[in-house]
Amino acid sequence: MPTVMIIVREGKTLDQKRAAAKGVTNALVEAFGVTPDQVSIQMIDQKAENIARGGILLPDRPKS
C-alpha cells in the first residue's frame, strides 16, 4: 500500500488539494498497479515561517 506525504505551504484551497490527491493517486495506480483505495495520502500544511530555502526562512527571502 503506497503512502505519500505532501508538505505544502499553508493556503492551498480544498479544490487544489482534491486535484493533487486525485493526480497523485492516479499516478500511483498506473505506476504500481494498485487500486485507488490502496493509496494513502497525507497533506501537511506548513506556515512559511517553518520553511527555509537556501538556509533562509521564506519570510526573510527577497520577494521576486
Set out the residue ranges of the language-model regions.
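A domain-level signal for the structural core that forms small-molecule/cofactor-binding pockets
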Residues: 1-64
